[in-house]
Amino acid sequence: MFLRIFGFIVSGVISLFIYFEVSNTSFSSNESNKDKLLLDLVSYVLDKLHYDPQIINDDFSAKVYDNFIDAIDSQKRFLLKSDLKLFSEYKYLIDDQINSSDITFFNLVYETLNKRIDEVENFYQEVLEVPFNFNTNEEINLDYDVLSFAENINELKTLWRKRLKLSVLDGFASKKETNEKENEEGTKELKSDQEIELESRESIIENLEDFFQFNSELERFDWFSIYLNSIVTQFDPHTSYLAPEAKEVFDQNISGKFQGIGARLLKRNQQVEISEVIIGGPVWRDNLLNVGDIILAVAQSKDEEPTEISLMKLSDATDLIKGEKGTNVYLTIKRVEGGIEEVEITRDIVELEETYAKSSIIKDDFNTFGLINLPRFYVDFDDYGERNAASDIKKEILSLKEKEINGLILDLRNNGGGSLKTVVDITGFFIEKGPVVQVKSIGGRKDILKDNDPSILWDGPLVILVNEFSASASEILAAALQDYNRA
């Protein structure tokens, strides 16, 4: 068993990310036993290591209950009132179940929800098989906070029919407006209302097929992760549980890189399709794949029998395709223009350029300004010496100084945070030395994070741009530089 705790700036305070890797050989393969052990581990970590431990009582239990129900069916699309009545028997017992590693409540909700989802999947297609009558006046309540759960399946069907009718109507209005405009321009023939209504229904059917396909690939553990997060977020909004798969995505997002072929995938009509070729990646460099190509099978060597992936969960198919830099993967591809062929790809480190700092020059009649946009405070947690926000900001500042700028603008708009260490380092580029931020840990211990380097990289005019989506690390950097009268 391997356990890691991550302290990470994401939204104004230091957040606790709990990540567990549990070896399949360390205990019984029974899923229920695994869930119980995981609940026990999470509870222990929160109790011993969280900055602000909570009292696990009936009030806590009620909040977890409300949070979990809202997380799984906030729009009242699946569950019935009778289900909620059954669930409510546990509303003030979840605290006891947490303390005893009991998952009876979760099991009940999980089984009931999946049953209801199957029922909806079986009847929504009937609703969309026939045209809607838009001449009939109907009302629908879209305020999900005040909307009640359906009394029974018939009422749920009515609710779905109205929502689908509204969705088709929205699509109809949009498609009709587009068609009329294209007709005026002479690029398209004018379509009948019946044709446009059919197109709108077909679009909704395709969207719902994708939704239920995605849902069918969710495993019990995915739902249990939602339950765990309903518990841990009661400690504070910035405490999260990350399953191994989510942790991998988290690392990719915060580092801005991953090892693989350099393509994004989606699942459509039971097939794995290339949705984007990432600039700079192996596929892009050698022009090996195109958007719309379908991956039929994957092999790790020329001699290996390819594994069909059409019926796989998308994340499982992705795991087969990704791999360490320098290794090869062999994909059986159905080309978007037709034809099937095998493509050999050498995996490499793929950098997501949209993650990284970028600079540009702004000029007016009298001055030249440097603008640096920083989307997030990225870092490789396994190796700070690798590319990170601070090292890239330093390079951009040096580059802009060579262009003899008169002032510098650091754009942190929409930057939701990231690595605290990079914040301290970046602050140091603009001040001689001194404290940047104070971190208070469990037990009341206070740590002052300082810039100890007396050198200043940029001592000229400095402007920091922030907006309502600038959070956490962005707020710390902006506040520190303001306190030092540097911005």
Question: Locations of the language-model features?
Answer:
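Cleft-lining beta-strand/loop regions that shape enzyme active-site pockets
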Residues: 23-26, 48-56, 215-221, 236-258, ...
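PDZ/PDZ-like domain segments forming the peptide/carboxylate-binding groove
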Residues: 54, 70-71, 92, 111-122, ...
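Extracytoplasmic/secreted proteins, especially bacterial periplasmic and envelope-associated proteins
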Residues: 37, 41, 59, 63, ...
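Acidic/histidine-rich, surface-exposed loop or edge segments in extracytoplasmic proteins
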Residues: 39-51, 89-93, 206-210, 375-378
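Extended, small/polar residue-biased N-terminal targeting/export presequences
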Residues: 56-62, 69-142, 205, 212-267, ...
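N-terminal mature-domain "stem" immediately C-terminal to a signal peptide or N-terminal signal-anchor/transmembrane
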Residues: 26-73
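Well-structured core secondary-structure elements of compact alpha/beta domains
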Residues: 146-156, 160-206, 271, 298, ...
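Hydrophobic membrane-insertion alpha-helices, especially the h-region
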Residues: 7-19
